[in-house]
């Protein structure tokens, strides 16, 4: 007889399908700093990220005890407050302050293709959540470079304000801005805090962003750094603050997106301010970044899959289940995930494109 073309073997077929992977938590803070450390251990590479996670590795920034450069105190103040990884990129001090600033901004070596200064932070193997360069970010030119880089890697940026009066600081704040330029993720700090230096045997003033970076790293990415008590023993410029008075200098600075250090009933000097230079809550920026980073990582494995209805439904359910864990631990008050009702179309699917809406508040 001829072959039966529709014949099927009367047996058993076992198909095993793994359930979608759990997406996990949002992750912790990781800091990236650029600055100088002229007495750093020769084994630490220059213009390359070096990971510091303890006072032992921090000591390599200055084995001589002279505490020279901008990175020594900045990293020390962070580690005093919270134990998080701090990646530092050490640049050489130039012949002039302007040369040093250029080294901090960095770029790409035209001969070797090596990334220098700020650009070197792009090769950090962990996801940076906070970046800065205490002592160098008090001008619009440098602030713009850090804002742009922060936008690209989805990290918040802590900037030095001008060493100026409140009125002049407000004028400077009006020069900065533009959410599409990355300034919505920039926290600008007004006055310089003083901390004790063993080398100087007295208090020394640090750049405004130094202690603010520590305050931002101390809390979760979706929490406000405002009202955090710092280790400041004094400030370069006293800012008038009264929680009941809306006419104070402090209130004026905050209304223009500038944070500052002032004495409060909590004792000592606290960081006051919780908005970026554009007025957006810096904690909300942190939440957006954290969720975005998690979705990018979780979506990597799904990029090669066919866009079938069951696949898309499964991915939507997976993200929605994960979002509900954020609701359960009170990271967000609520949220839902669904396919965009208008942007998704047959032509988009044919092109491998689909849109998922993550609605949270």
Regions found by a protein language model. Name each.
Residues 2-21, 25-56, 104-301, 336, ...:
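A glycine- and small-residue-enriched flexible loop/hinge signal that marks low-structured segments
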Residues 45-93:
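N-terminal assembly/attachment segments of tailed bacteriophage virion structural proteins
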Residues 65, 277, 281, 305, ...:
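Hydrophobic alpha-helical scaffolding
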Residues 75-79, 120-122, 146-150, 319-327:
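Hydrophobic, Leu/Ile/Phe/Ala-enriched alpha-helical segments that form helix-helix packing faces
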Residues 84-114:
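Well-ordered mid-protein domain cores that form the structural environment of catalytic cofactors
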Residues 290-343:
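Extended, compositionally biased non-globular segments
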Residues 343-361:
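C-terminal edge-of-domain segments
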């Amino acid at each position: 007889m001829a072959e039966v073309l529709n014949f099927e073997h009367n047996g058993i077929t076992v198909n095993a399908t793994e359930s979608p992977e759990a997406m996990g938590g949002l992750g912790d803070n990781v800091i990236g700093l650029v600055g100088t450390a002229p007495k750093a251990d020769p084994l630490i590479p220059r213009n390359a990220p070096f990971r510091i996670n303890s006072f032992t590795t921090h000591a390599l920034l200055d084995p001589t005890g002279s505490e020279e450069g901008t990175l020594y105190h900045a990293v020390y103040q962070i580690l005093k407050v919270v134990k998080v990884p701090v990646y530092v990129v050490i640049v050489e001090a130039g012949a002039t302050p302007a040369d040093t600033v250029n080294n901090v901004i960095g770029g790409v070596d035209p001969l070797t293709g090596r990334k220098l200064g700020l650009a070197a932070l792009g090769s950090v193997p962990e996801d940076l959540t906070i970046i800065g360069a205490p002592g160098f970010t008090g001008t619009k030119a440098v602030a713009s470079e850090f804002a742009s880089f922060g936008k690209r890697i989805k990290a918040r940026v802590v900037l030095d304000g001008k060493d100026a009066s409140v009125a002049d600081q407000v004028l400077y704040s009006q020069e900065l801005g533009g959410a599409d330029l990355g300034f919505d993720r920039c926290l600008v700090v007004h006055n310089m805090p003083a901390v004790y230096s063993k080398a100087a045997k007295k208090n020394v003033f640090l750049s405004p962003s130094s202690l603010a970076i520590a305050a931002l790293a101390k809390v979760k990415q979706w929490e406000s750094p405002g009202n955090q008590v710092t280790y400041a023993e004094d400030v370069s410029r006293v800012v008038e603050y009264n929680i009941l008075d809306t006419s104070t200098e402090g209130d004026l600075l905050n209304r223009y997106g500038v944070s500052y250090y002032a004495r409060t009933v909590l004792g000592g000097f606290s960081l006051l301010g919780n908005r970026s230079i554009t007025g957006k809550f810096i904690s909300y920026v942190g939440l957006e970044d954290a969720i975005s980073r998690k979705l990018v990582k979780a979506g990597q494995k799904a990029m090669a899959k066919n866009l079938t209805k069951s696949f898309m439904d499964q991915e939507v359910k997976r993200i929605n289940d994960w979002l509900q864990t954020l609701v359960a631990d009170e990271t967000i008050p609520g949220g839902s995930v669904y396919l965009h009702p208008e942007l998704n179309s047959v032509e988009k699917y044919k092109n491998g494109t689909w849109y998922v809406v993550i609605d949270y508040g």
